[in-house]
Amino acid sequence: TIYITSPEYNSVGQMIFRDNIQPMIYGKNVLILNGAITTGATLSRAVESILYYGGKIRGVAAIFSAVNSIAQLPVHSIFQQRDIPDYGSYKFHDCPLCKNKQKIDAIVNGWGYSKL
């Protein structure tokens, strides 16, 4: 049996799984699938959550990753940072585009984009 699920987030940003989903994780081999991994922060929360709920993480895969590994787990990705010229990920106070007051064109997330 293969289960595919996504976590919810509580008020402090922790990933949680409801009671009806927990049996899909507890004692199971888990493959974490991501679209994009930039800093690894969300991936770290995913690892913490899956281990908390008793899952056995067997792999991490993504379409793009700027991170090679997390928590001693290799990240397997189709594209890496070296494949995207001039790729950068910054904290807002370190962003060179922000410092140059360069405006952004849109906000993009899993539901689409909104032009600004």
Language-model-derived ranges and their functions:
Residues 20-62:
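A contiguous pocket-lining binding segment that forms or flanks enzyme active sites
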Residues 47-116:
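PRPP-dependent phosphoribosyltransferase catalytic core
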Residues 10-12, 35, 67:
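Generic structural signal for helix capping and beta-alpha/helix-loop junctions
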Residues 13, 18, 45, 83-86:
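Short, flexible coil/linker segments at or flanking structured domains
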Residues 1-31, 41, 92:
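Short, glycine/charge-rich flexible loops or terminal/linker lids adjacent to PRPP-binding catalytic cores
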